[in-house]
């Protein structure tokens, strides 16, 4: 005759949080063992691609990991992918370049105008 099994916890429905597998103990009994939920891989905040170098765990398991395993040692390490960080840095650089170019252009225009005024006054 087959041994009957009962859940060890109060939840009696077959939900994802109540997933079990049958295991035979050293004493020969069959018991339910609870399986934890599988974690999701963290994703990039901008483009949504999976972040490389960070394990897929449940949120409460990340607190037990050392910081070197939780993040990547780079700017925006655990939240943005390398491609998005590169784009952000390049964009910031180009914006700064544009600002300085604008200032230089204004100065050149001002100098040119002053030279014209000097020539016309003579």
From Swiss-Prot:
Keywords: Ribonucleoprotein, Ribosomal protein. The keyword Ribonucleoprotein applies. GO terms for biological process: ribosome biogenesis; translation. InterPro entries: Ribosomal_eL34, Ribosomal_eL34_C_sf. GO terms for molecular function: structural constituent of ribosome. It comes from the Eukaryota. The keyword Transmembrane helix does not apply. Coiled coil: none annotated. GO terms for cellular component: cytosolic large ribosomal subunit. Belongs to the eukaryotic ribosomal protein eL34 family. This is Large ribosomal subunit protein eL34. It comes from Dictyostelium discoideum.
